[in-house]
A protein has these predicted regions:
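Single-residue signature of alpha-solenoid repeat helices
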Residues: 36, 72-73, 109, 113, ...
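Eukaryotic all-alpha helical interaction scaffolds
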Residues: 44-47, 63-64, 80, 84, ...
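Structural signature of alpha-solenoid helical repeat junctions
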Residues: 51, 69, 88-92, 128-130, ...
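Residue-level recognition of tetratricopeptide repeat
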Residues: 25, 61, 98, 102, ...
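Position-specific recognition of the canonical hydrophobic site in helix A of tetratricopeptide repeat
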Residues: 28, 64, 105, 136, ...
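N-terminal leader/linker segments that initiate helical-solenoid repeat arrays
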Residues: 12-78, 82, 86-91, 95, ...
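Residue register of alpha-helical TPR repeats
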Residues: 18, 54, 91-95, 133, ...
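Structural motif corresponding to the intra-repeat A-B loop/turn of tetratricopeptide repeats
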Residues: 30, 66-67, 103, 107, ...
């Protein structure tokens, strides 16, 4: 009798797992707020909380930049967070924190988001890497409303990333910290953060996945009056551009860097070349 019950429970569990996987696949191929999408979410209501929270997590990731979809994703993720067991709640917390960062400038849920982010550390058990990511996402959220809190969060993220072998997250955290210093117009500190990010990038196995930030480094140096160094980084930017769009939207910046060095004729030559490209439909910012 006991063996039969165990067999039935095991069979039921497999069916629930298979149904969850199927619903998740179909959600990823559907459009949020469509009747088909809503129907798939409703079909998860008969699943145990463990599986339903996974379905809601996937549903909450399927939003675009439309505010209506973000609002609906927020509903899915908050419900997933409410019912999720510990080994799913951490993933939901990260996704909801990321979403709040997307909503911050165009939604009315700022206070709700602050309460949520403030409570997560005492409610959720993260791995070290997840915790670092949480503080990074928190800093992204706070950078628009509380610069001091954003600095504290990114510093917590950096302290956690330093204990990990994966440097991709640490690079992104230094870039975010550089952005925060830029808001304060503290360009020496900003460039120091970019330098550290670049040092990590050079030895990272993820260097092909990290979006280059040479333009930001050059802009920071230009604000410090270090035009010659800025020009070197703008040249690195140019190397990344296809030959058909040489200079591209960086023509003005490169020309300003040459002008700052006193090479005014060279700057004029670049701008004249940019104007010719504009006439051919190639360059739009000169």
């Amino acid at each position: 009798m006991g063996i039969t019950i165990l067999f039935l429970l095991s069979s039921c569990r497999k069916n629930e797992k298979a149904k969850t996987a199927e619903l998740c696949r179909e959600l990823e191929n559907s459009v949020m707020l469509s009747p088909a999408f809503d129907s798939l979410v409703k079909m998860s209501m008969g699943l145990p909380n463990f599986f339903r929270s996974k379905v809601l997590l996937v549903a909450g990731r399927c939003y675009s930049t439309k505010v209506e979809q973000m609002q609906q994703a927020r509903i899915y993720l908050r419900e997933a967070y409410r019912i999720a067991p510990r080994d799913v709640k951490n993933l939901v917390a990260l996704e909801l924190t990321r979403l709040y960062g997307s909503l911050i400038l165009r939604d009315s849920c700022v206070e709700e988001a602050i309460r949520f982010i403030s409570r997560v550390p005492s409610k959720v058990v993260f791995t070290r890497e997840e915790e670092a990511k949480f503080y990074y996402l928190g800093a992204c959220f706070f950078k628009s409303i509380d610069i001091d809190r954003a600095f504290r969060a990114v510093d917590q993220a950096l302290s956690l990333y330093r204990g990990l072998s994966d440097t991709e997250g640490e690079i992104e955290a230094y870039r975010l910290k550089a952005t925060l210093y830029g808001v304060l117009q503290e360009y020496e500190e900003q460039y120091a953060c970019y330098e550290e990010a670049y040092r990590l990038l050079r030895r990272s196995r993820f260097r092909d996945k990290v979006k280059p930030f040479y333009e930001q480094m050059a802009a920071s140096l230009k604000k410090l009056g270090r035009h010659e160094e800025a020009l070197l980084w703008y040249e690195e930017v140019l190397k990344e551009l296809p030959d058909s769009s040489r200079l591209g939207r960086y023509g003005i910046q490169v020309a300003e860097a040459y002008s700052g060095l006193g090479y005014h004729e060279k700057a004029r030559e670049i701008l004249r070349g940019g104007l010719m490209n504009e006439k051919r439909g190639g360059m739009r910012n000169v």
